[in-house]
A protein has these predicted regions:
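Alpha-helical transmembrane segments
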Residues: 2-12
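Interhelical loop and helix-boundary elements at the membrane-water interface
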Residues: 10-52, 70, 74-110
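Transmembrane helix interruption/hinge and helix-loop junction motifs
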Residues: 1-3, 56-65, 107-108
């Protein structure tokens, strides 16, 4: 697939995984600064980033990109939840990662 095709798929997947597939519960539960009683924040964060990383793996075929997505997405979302970065910065980091994964996927020989 071309860079633009992969990038479009990654952006669509990101929109799905960061909004309807995350939902209100995971969005709140992953915040360690305002935890939901009885719900370990790290389990909610793990569920969210595994969904994100899974889409990256399925679309790019790259386990390395998926692992990088998992780690970077978790760190970025935690920084947003802890008010160290803004929502817009969070989304910009996510989209820059998608550009990187699309580049890797488009330039990797199958």
């Amino acid at each position: 697939m071309s860079f633009w095709h992969v990038l479009a798929l990654l952006i669509i997947a990101h929109a799905l995984a960061d909004y309807p597939l995350q939902g209100d519960f995971l969005s709140k539960a992953k915040n360690r600064r305002a935890p939901i009683p009885g719900v370990p924040w790290y389990q909610a964060m793990a569920a969210h980033v595994v969904i994100q990383a899974g889409f990256v793996w399925i679309i790019t075929g790259s386990a390395a990109c998926a692992v990088a997505e998992l780690v970077i997405h978790a760190v970025t979302d935690d920084a947003k939840c802890c008010n160290r970065i803004s929502f817009n910065t969070d989304q910009a980091v996510h989209l820059l990662c998608k550009v990187a994964w699309a580049y890797v996927a488009a330039h990797t020989v199958p």
